[in-house]
């Protein structure tokens, strides 16, 4: 049986035991993660997602992709050349299980990308100054 999952803006066709290179996830090596955005699993096709389906995986390592070099040269300007390189950060995951139902009750943490913002804790409001303290500061 196979599934099609979506993570990092890309879609992957996976089976149990497959090793994938996906966009960087907030997980350490050895952690178990769960992909909840399943577009298709077995013969069930979602519209757009299959309800209750999930793909579980184990994080193997965080790696960097091959370097992509960009070379910029502007005509008619002497010594106006620039070389830049970029290495995309990736996470290696091994698919362990395909769940058609009950993915929301499995207890495994969901796979979250590195750029996803987590809501900050609510900070307590500062105590307001009394009128006497405020007027004392204005006098100084």
UniProtKB/Swiss-Prot annotation:
Keyword Lipoprotein: no
Function: This protein binds to 23S rRNA in the presence of protein L20.
A matching Pfam family: Ribosomal_L21p
Cited PANTHER family: 50S RIBOSOMAL PROTEIN L21, LARGE RIBOSOMAL SUBUNIT PROTEIN BL21M
GO BP terms: translation
Family matches, as NCBIfam families: L21
Name of the protein in its database record: Large ribosomal subunit protein bL21
Region (Disordered): 106-140
Entries under HAMAP family matching the protein: Ribosomal_bL21 (MF_01363)
Gene Ontology terms: cellular component: cytoplasm; ribonucleoprotein complex; ribosome
InterPro entries recorded: bL21-like, bL21-like_sf, Ribosomal_bL21
Self-association and partners: Part of the 50S ribosomal subunit. Contacts protein L20.
Disulfide bonds: none
Protein keywords: Ribonucleoprotein, Ribosomal protein, RNA-binding, rRNA-binding
């Amino acid at each position: 049986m196979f599934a099609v999952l979506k993570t990092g803006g890309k879609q992957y066709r996976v089976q149990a035991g497959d090793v994938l290179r996906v966009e960087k996830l907030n997980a350490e090596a050895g952690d178990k993660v769960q992909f909840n955005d399943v577009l298709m699993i077995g013969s069930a096709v979602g519209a757009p997602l299959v309800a209750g389906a999930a793909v579980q995986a184990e994080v193997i390592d965080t790696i960097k992709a091959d370097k992509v070099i960009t070379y910029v040269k502007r005509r008619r300007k002497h010594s106006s050349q620039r070389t830049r390189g970029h290495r995309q950060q990736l996470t290696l995951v091994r698919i362990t299980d395909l769940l058609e139902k009950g993915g929301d009750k499995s207890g495994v943490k969901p796979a979250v990308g590195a750029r996803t913002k987590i809501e900050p804790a609510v900070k307590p409001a500062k105590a307001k100054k009394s009128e006497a303290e405020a007027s004392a500061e204005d006098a100084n």
